[in-house]
Amino acid sequence: MKRLNIILLFFSFYLFSCGVSIKKLNKYAAIEVYPEDEFLKISTSKKAMIVVAHDDDPAAMSGTLTMLKKQGWKIKQLCFTSGNQSRDSAMLIASKIFLDEIEFINIPPQMRRLDFDSSIIPYMPIPKSEFSSKFDLEKIHSIVLTKINEFAPTVIFTLDNEMGGYGHPEHVLLSEFVFNAFKNNQINPERLYQSVYTNSMEDKILKDRLTNQMKKWGFPNSYMSALKMYKLDGMPEPDVQINIESCAEEKMRYLRTFNERERKTIGFYVPYFEKSNAKKYFSVFNREFFRVIKPSIN
């Protein structure tokens, strides 16, 4: 039995090692180079807050968050409840990798959209001018503002406020609110870090690969719809990059802790992460990219 277990363990390791080639991974990796981030290295106040719509939204910044945790930062995440006990429970397990605390905004999906019905594809973008008629903005904004000011973070991590990564209305809604609250001095972190992709990553992962995947399943690509609706060329360009290769094992463990449905969703934007071991995968995808926003100078 012991010998059989060793053989099975070796076989599993072999599958992960050979599941996808370095050449194939490199096809989707960033080719651009940006300045290395300095602010997070020198900050003496070490409190970070992640404000996102959904539990799995920090996937593309989870290496950086793991690194900060190792450096003694206190980290809290605020996001909507999924309305699914199994999914929320999986998030609580995943959160232990780099979070000190996670708090759910207790408004389930069917109650967040005022126009909710079975015909709606919830991830498809909507005009920003319609947010006030589609969401209870006053309630959502009040909760988020209160929670941010109670925690008083040094840094807030969000998705970008222009298209929320790939156009999901709830991504845009929360990221834009945090951005505007920061600019209007309603909240007082020292920096906003918006997780973004480089142009080459967007072209290869979101424009090409995601469009083909969605087309096979008969669904529209929200990213392409968001570009057209918001009149954008893509996400905002990064200001900095952060090398996260030293946190490869923790980031891979975080990504794989989610339930199967969420792992498939993450796989749209983090290609082939389930078909490789951490060391090989993050030797290629070894950087995370951020737009950094500083306080307004009055």
Protein language model annotation of sequence segments:
Residues M1-L4:
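Positively charged n-region of N-terminal signal peptides that target proteins for export
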Residues I6-I7, P295:
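General helical structural elements
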Residues I7-L15:
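Bacterial N-terminal signal peptides
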Residues I7-L8, R112, K251:
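A broad, structure-centric signal for solvent-exposed, well-ordered loop/edge residues
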Residues Y14, F80-L92, E170-S175, L227:
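Short, charged N-terminal helix-start/capping segments
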Residues G19-A48, E130, K134-N298:
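Metal-dependent de-N-acetylase/amidase catalytic core
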Residues G19-F151, N180-N184:
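Active-site rim/loop-helix segments in enzyme catalytic domains that contact anionic ligands
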